[in-house]
Amino acid sequence: MENCKVIAITNQKGGVGKTTTTVNLGVGLASSGKRVLLVDADPQGSLTVSLGVKNPDELDVSLSSLMQSVIDDEPLAEGAIIRHQEGVDLLPSNIELSGMETGLFNVMSREYVLKNAIDGMRKSYDYILIDCMPSLGMMTVNALVAADSVIIPSQPNFLSTKGLNLLLRS
C-alpha cells in the first residue's frame, strides 16, 4: 500500500484527547475497510492499555524494541504488532520507551529512528496513526519526522490552546 498515510496525533498538553482520537479514528478507518496500524509512542502506554493489553511492561517486544533494532542496524524484532478485534493493528508501548527516549540523545540521526522503524511497514497499511506523549521530547520529534501530517486535538480552554501554540512554534 504505497499510499500509506502516517499521521501523528500530538499536543504538548495532556488530557486533550490524543489517545481517544487515535483509537476512534483508527477503528473508524478500519471499519471502512482500511488497513490501520496504531503506534503507541507514549511510555505511559495509554493507547496500549486502551486496546486491552493488561500488563504492557511484561511485553517481550514493543516500539522500544523495534527502535533499538534500528539503532543497532539489525533486522526489526518480530512479534511486536498485536492484532486487535476492532480490526486495527497495534504497535504497543511500555515504560522501556522512557529509557529509549533518553538514549536517543546519543544516537546519530536520532530524529529519524521511528521513521526508519515504520517505513518498512508502510506497504502493509493504508494508515499509520502515532499517538504521542504530551511533550515535545525526542519521541514526539521522531513522530513528527515520521509523519506525513499531524492532528492536534485541542479543547476550547486556555491551557489546551497554549499547548497548541507551543507545538506550532516548535
Residue ranges of predicted features:
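P-loop NTP-binding core
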Residues: M1-S170
